[in-house]
């Protein structure tokens, strides 16, 4: 069974994370890249939805157990490969010539929330799940690129509160501050609304992709030029 599945619903590509808490490690990053590449290779695809198979978690963020194991075994190349591969996932979402929609059907912690912020739009169910950045409590700073694209998705005043407090925020509050498009009643309603929204798009890839390239040019520059300053020496912990 794949940890990330790709399916088509008409012209909408649905990428489903299917590994429990969907903690992010090198295998996860490679699977996400492959799924996105395959989705975009299909010229009939007009939108992409990223969601989770589970009821409780969208993604619990970085696989800290895997990361500590890599550190303890001095497998630094794996750590670097993971971080660069996740940056590739983020850049593909930021530059995809079709809308990328996160259907957040459970907890989105840390890198899980960050992944959703790389998407163009977000929907989240209200009956279960929190959205938060616990990095301040686990002493793992954001990379510069992450800061840049999260700020496109979350108003500065709210991101300032969330990143410095680690506060857990539920869907209704996220909707109030325009971080998500809609707080949905449950998973069924979430997928119905996210898919209905995805189907409203049938834009030409050329102009849609060019708009995203121009919108996010500065973010891509930060990811490519500033992130390696922290990734190469693995200067990741505060």
Residue map of PLM features:
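Glycine-rich beta-to-alpha transition loops that act as phosphate-gripper elements at the mouths
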Residues: 103-109, 162-168
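Catalytic-core regions built around general acid/base machinery
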Residues: 35-38, 85-97
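C-terminal long alpha-helix characteristic of the crotonase
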Residues: 124-125, 175-226
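Hydrophobic/aromatic residues within transmembrane alpha-helices
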Residues: 50, 115-116, 174, 194
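Well-ordered beta-strand positions
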Residues: 121, 161, 165-167, 182
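CoA-thioester-processing core
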Residues: 109-161, 193
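Conserved CoA-thioester-binding segment of acyl-CoA-metabolizing enzymes
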Residues: 1-51
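Glycine- (often His-adjacent) and acidic-residue-rich active-site loop
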Residues: 5, 52-88
């Amino acid at each position: 069974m794949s940890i990330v599945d790709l399916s088509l619903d008409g012209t909408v590509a649905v990428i489903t994370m299917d590994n429990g808490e969907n903690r992010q490690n090198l295998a996860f990053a490679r699977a996400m890249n492959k799924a996105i590449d395959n989705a975009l290779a299909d010229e009939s695809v007009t939108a992409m939805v990223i969601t989770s198979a589970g009821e409780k978690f969208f993604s619990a963020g970085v696989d800290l157990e895997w990361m500590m194991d890599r550190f303890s075994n001095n497998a630094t190349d794996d750590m670097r490969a993971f971080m660069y591969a996740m940056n590739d996932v983020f850049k593909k979402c930021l530059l995809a010539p079709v809308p990328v929609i996160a259907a957040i059907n459970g907890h989105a912690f840390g890198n899980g929330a960050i992944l959703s912020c790389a998407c163009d739009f977000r929907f989240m169910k209200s009956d279960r799940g929190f959205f938060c950045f616990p990095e301040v409590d686990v002493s793992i700073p954001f990379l510069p690129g992450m800061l840049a694209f999260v700020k496109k998705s979350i108003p500065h005043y709210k991101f300032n509160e969330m990143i410095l407090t680690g506060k857990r925020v539920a869907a209704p509050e996220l909707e109030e501050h325009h971080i998500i498009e809609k707080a949905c009643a449950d998973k069924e309603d979430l997928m119905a609304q996210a898919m209905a929204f995805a189907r409203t798009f049938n834009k030409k890839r050329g102009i849609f992709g060019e708009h995203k390239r121009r919108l996010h040019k500065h973010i891509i520059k930060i990811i490519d030029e500033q992130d390696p300053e922290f990734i190469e020496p693995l200067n990741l912990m505060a």
